[in-house]
Each structure stands twice: as structure tokens, then as C-alpha cells.
């Protein structure tokens, strides 16, 4: 931990949030047990990662209760402090959010990973209406909104635990405010309070089961197939090459959302595992796909397109993999999305600094396998995170190509707002690094109802029945996890 003198020196350099860090051994705990001890209440989060579908990433992140958060819906933003609105803004929320983030000047913590606090949460799909370069082409008609969640919700994370899964150590991070005369002392006291919480045992909430329920499609199979045929008509007319319609399913779910996270992380380990408690609703997900990642001046997108079910035996698994890589339709769709990713990254990158690294590799998850590629670029000077978001949002894999025309068609054919689905979840650090996953393989739990949404890439030779089945396959991991909870994880 830095000394009072070091703290004062950093304050003199103009930093208005200064991290105090304490390192402890926590090798007898897991990220889940630590979350139960330190957080497990509204406006907290747990973020984990599984690399290559096989091993947990080095770091996990637990956000302690956030006193400040922003909610944006339409052209209005509310800033909350301890549950009370303390600031409001009318107009495009994105410049306001960027300015809010930029209020905080913090030194880096060299010994820790790139994320050690900042804005954490989501940008829902309807954020599209705030990007001026294509919003004027979208009608933004009033649609049904079964979930009723904000378009954007971001927490200001100033107290967190960074878990090093390799060493078994936990790094407690509390930001001190040097504008307060006793800011340093208050942060030290807060660290001691958190240490006390760690020493206490926590009650493990057992999942003993509940009544079994079935997921019901909002769209319905036949209307969805008709939607696929309508999109094919647009494709044959030359309007577009691909569109990704989606359908939402819902089911009664009265169990703990944290139990759902336990089941999902076991059933479908993914590069982005996340649990957000927003008070009146929860987001639980295991997304395989980056929307965009910024690390200093490098930017990465990672398109995923092309799907097969996992085989029941190694031989069947290999056969499915070979079948996927030899499927001309799937390869053509994936190449189109690589080109879209190159175009998106190229808008914000220096000339000649965009490259495809991993190209058409297979990644395997619990229920499905995908074709994946990596597109990287070196940012132009002066690019902001909102410039990056504007260039990459929404993902081509969730919209289609050309992107804007595909979004117009989605707006026409889908019956309700997408909400969180198809948007982005993740972190925007104080250091301006950003790591956002696409909100897929993601459940929203609200009012004892679980919602999950999934899409299918429709091209000229798509079969409506196959595209309907693809949406079922993609939602299967979340629905199976919910049914595991209903059967009882701890019986």
C-alpha cells in the first residue's frame, strides 16, 4: 500500500482518485465464495474468464457495492448516488457518459491487470439510436419492451477485489478522494472493513430445486420462419447480403440468479463469464465473443460465425468440425464478417495497421462449436472510446451486412426492443482501456422471469427451419442451466 506521502505526491500531480491496494492470501476461497462475502447485493458484479473453453483465466474481478451509477433511456441520463438522482442530462447520452468517465484521473497500478476500476455494465442494443452516422436511417419506432430495462446502465466501480487465480492472492482496491481532508485515512479504514468481511464465514445459499418450467418463444416458430423468408426476399432484391434476426424466449424462474450463474459457468465456460446485480434485475451470461477490446492504442474485434453442435464422442466432434469447415455457406458467411470487422476496425485505425491474425479457427463450447477469427488494428491518434464504440457497435455478427441496411430490416421484422441482447457488456477502465463482450448466451432475470435471446445469420440459401433450429441451439446453454437450477444444484 502506498504511504501517505506517496498519496499526497500523486494528489499534487492532479490525480483526483488514488488507489490504495492491499494484497492478501485467499487460496482457500473461490471467486464465488469471495463474491458472497464481499458483495452479493445490488450494484455489484462478478467477472470471470475461461480461456479456450478449457481453463480459467488468471484474473477474476469482484465489484463491491457501487454508490454511483448511470442509467440512460432514450435521450435522458440519470446519475445516481446511494439510490438518489444527483445529476440529470437530456440529449445524446454518449458524449455525457464519456465526459463523466473523464472526470476521474487515476494513476495506474503496475502490479495488477489493466482493469482496476472504472465504468462497468452494459450498452443495450438500442444504443444504436445515438450514433449519428446511421441513426438518421433508422425509424426508432416505439416497440414493445417486455423487459423494461435501461438502454445503458454503467456502475462507477471504485471498490473492487482482483483475484489472482494463479497465485491464490486477492488484491483489494479502494479509491481515495484527495479532495476530502481525510480521504487517505477513510480509504485505509475501508480496506480494514473489507478485510474483516473476508475473515468472516458466509452462508452458502443452497440450490435445492423448484418447479420445472419451459421456455416459450415470443416470436413463435412459424412467424420466425416467415421472417426468414422475408429477409431472403430482401437479399434476392439486392438490399443486403446477410441479416441476423433474433427471437426471445422466456420462462418462469423463481430461483436465485446467482445459482443460475453457478450452473452456467459450469455448463458453458466462456471467455466472458459475468454476473451483474442491478437490484431489480440481474444479467447472467457466458459470452464467447468480443465486441471490441482496447489495450492502450491497440484495438481488437473477434468475429464468430459458423456453428455446429458438439459431438457426443470425440470422433463425432471431429466430424462436426470438419463438416463445419467444409460448409461453403458457413465459410462464405464468416469471410463476409471478417471483411466487415476489417472495415469497422479500419475506420479508427492507422492506414496499413489492420491485420487478420487468427483466421477461421475452431473454438468449442459446451453445446456448440464456432468458426472464429481475430482482426486487430493500431488506433489513429486522438481516437476516443466513443469513436471505437461507434465504429464497432453493434457487432456485424448480430446485425448483418451491409450493417446499416441489415439494422433497418431488423427494426422492421423483430416484434420488440432487443434490450441488452446484441449490445455489449463489460468494463471501461479509469486508464481508458475497454473490454466489451457481445451480449449473447446471456440471461436477464427480472420479476421471476428469465429471458434469453438468440439469432441466426440469414443469407440467400438459408433454410428457415435450420435458422429456427440455430436460435434454439444457441439458447440451449442458458435454458439448460436454468433447468439444472430448477432440478437443484445442491440436492
Swiss-Prot record:
Source organism: Neisseria meningitidis serogroup B (strain ATCC BAA-335 / MC58)
Cofactor note: Binds 1 Mg(2+) ion per subunit.
Keyword Protein biosynthesis set for record: no
Binding site for L-tryptophan: 49, 271-273
Chemical reaction(s) catalysed: chorismate + L-glutamine = anthranilate + pyruvate + L-glutamate + H(+)
GO molecular function annotation: anthranilate synthase activity; metal ion binding
Annotated chorismate binding sites: 306-307, 421, 441, 455-457
A Pfam family hit: Anth_synt_I_N
Key words of the record: Amino-acid biosynthesis, Aromatic amino acid biosynthesis, Lyase, Magnesium, Metal-binding, Tryptophan biosynthesis
Pathway linked to the protein: Amino-acid biosynthesis; L-tryptophan biosynthesis; L-tryptophan from chorismate: step 1/5
Enzyme Commission (EC) number: 4.1.3.27
This protein's name: Anthranilate synthase component 1
Gene for this chain: trpE
